[in-house]
Amino acid sequence: MLLTNEQIEIINSQEKEIKIIAGAGAAKTTTLVEFTKVRPNKTFLYIAFNKSVKQEGEKRFGSNVLVKTAHGLAYSNFVSKRYKVVNELKEKDFREIFDEYSDLIDFAEFVYTINRCFELYCHLPHNKPLLPYQIKSTNTNFVNNVNKAIGVVVNKMIKGELPMTHDAYLKFYMLTNPQLNYDYILFDEGQDASPVMLRIFASQ
């Protein structure tokens, strides 16, 4: 395979951190494959952005490279067989948790607000309460109640009393401050990564 001077420079680099900026079709993955080939005694974790990229990576990388999506990594290390996972929470899930509010005329709106805010919480790279502008309310009491409700949802999920969403277990995995024991971590299509994904890998 004929490599460009730029690719050769990257492959031979001894820098601790390397960022590759290139357009579509610029052989970024090929560069990463060659990077691993010249380091057969090193261990690599290759993070693919989605399932199709992961499947392609599994075909191209050698045995010293573990290929995972970020969610796949979190699932295997945090979820395993301990938790039930769903694509999204339903109204019945919230109705069981917040039974005292279930007779409210605007319960559907209550569920929508908690669900939306919980999804936002799952995308933030920290464990701080949501701010008023994020909840879209200037009512301090309402903001506090929403944050309390999010805390209830989190605790129920951790205890296994409520199924986890995919973004939830990724967030919970991040909060464990995982240490990934690989010589190199390769993050393909990093520009599309969520703040939670970036927090996991930037903290290594």
Task: Label every model-predicted segment.
Residues 1-83:
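P-loop NTPase Walker
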Residues 4-9, 18-19, 145-204:
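Conserved helicase NTPase motor core
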Residues 42, 85-89, 181-182:
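Short, charged low-complexity intrinsically disordered segments located at boundaries
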Residues 51, 68-71, 75, 105, ...:
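Non-catalytic, well-ordered alpha-helical scaffold segments
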Residues 66, 74-99, 170-175:
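Conserved P-loop NTPase motor core of helicases/translocases
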Residues 82-158:
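ATP-hydrolysis module of ASCE/P-loop NTPase motor domains
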